[in-house]
Amino acid sequence: MTIHEFGQNHDEVVVLVHPSATMWDYFEYVIPLMQDRYHLIVPALPGYDTETGSDFTSVPEIAEKLANWLIAHGHREIACIYGCSMGGAVVTRFLADRKVKAQSAVIDGGITPYQLPWIVTRLIAVKDFLLISMGKLGGLKILQKAFSTDEYSEEDLQYIVKVLKHMSAKTIWRTFESCNNYAMPKPVVVDCDCIEYWYAKAEEKDRKSDIAYIKKNLPQTLFKVFGHVGHGGLAALKPDLLAEELTRVMGRDKRDETGTNANSDFRN
């Protein structure tokens, strides 16, 4: 897992964890907007790291390695950790491990463990594996049918094609199997009071079980709904909004942190 750093001269540390089917440069439009104010730490996760050629391992292992890296480099407390989709799963487990104190955290469309029978979760993993494998083999034509072309340019889709070609079959399988079924401590106890779960209005139905899981296990979480963007679309399509919202989250005062609960949401 290669770690990329920007704005190292700043004290406030912000960790950005990318989703699946992307690489660390998923944040290429966000980094220039934040590196003049924050020390940004952007890991290239196993299986999506062109510098190591490794396969994806698991959500718990990646969360642990990320925390260990932060501790080894003197970051026992950070201003914020943000993760999208698969990255949101890593953030969820990272918070539960409580190795590093995060003053704030954002789980953007994050995947939580399925609360379903074992055989059902495996069938879902097989379906997801086959869909991504088809995209890997079918290339741009398949992706143009799968994604809304009025949101993503051909250049954006070519980027996804490049990432899919890099992903091994083992990485594809482990990504879905682990993101859908990763273990969490029981009970879930975190030491971060300022947590937000973000999701797009268009994916509200798809995130229903994830939202329910977060409400049950992280009751201090505030929910924010975004319109005019799809799952994981903020970094690529609205980087200014993402940077602005992360800055807002880090600026929430103690009164706001304790006064808003999981039954609340606000819309953008």
Outline where the language-model segments fall:
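Conserved alpha/beta-hydrolase catalytic His-Asp/Glu region
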Residues: 116-117, 136-189
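Short beta-strand/loop motif that positions the catalytic acidic residue
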Residues: 191, 196-199
